[in-house]
Swiss-Prot record:
Expressed by the venom gland. The lineage of its organism: Eukaryota, Metazoa, Ecdysozoa, Arthropoda, Chelicerata. It comes from Centruroides tecomanus (Scorpion). This is Beta-toxin Ct6. It is found in: Secreted. Has the structural arrangement of an alpha-helix connected to antiparallel beta-sheets by disulfide bonds (CS-alpha/beta). The keyword Transmembrane helix does not apply. The modification Cysteine amide is found at residue 83. It comes from the Eukaryota. GO terms for molecular function: sodium channel inhibitor activity; toxin activity. Residues 19-84 form the LCN-type CS-alpha/beta domain. Disulfide bonds join 30-83, 34-59, 43-64, 47-66. Beta toxins bind voltage-independently at site-4 of sodium channels (Nav) and shift the voltage of activation toward more negative potentials thereby affecting sodium channel activation and promoting spontaneous and repetitive firing. GO terms for biological process: defense response.
Length: 85
């Protein structure tokens, strides 16, 4: 039982300190695009860069999706900034 409670606590701590979402351009407010064939490598590099500090990234629905970013990371949609408007 103690092992279960400890595992549950570790999972909850991981959920609190990790953020998932689409990378966003601060200039346009749009998602950072990618292509399905080569996008996974590109997105992984972008997501794990020093700018975003994510754990992993991949191309999903023609946009870069990141997992494990810090809570203060900006992801799509940005407040007060709509894409293309």
């Amino acid at each position: 039982m103690k092992t279960f409670v400890l595992a549950l606590c570790l999972v909850l701590i991981g959920m609190v300190y990790a953020k998932d979402g689409y990378l966003v351009s601060k200039h346009t407010g749009c998602k950072l695009g990618c292509s399905p064939k080569i996008g996974d490598r590109y997105c992984h590099i972008e997501c794990t860069s020093m700018n975003h500090k994510g754990d992993e990234g991949y191309c999903y629905w023609l946009a870069c999706y990141c997992k494990g970013m810090p809570e203060n990371a900006e992801v799509y949609p940005l407040p007060n900034k709509s894409c293309g408007k």
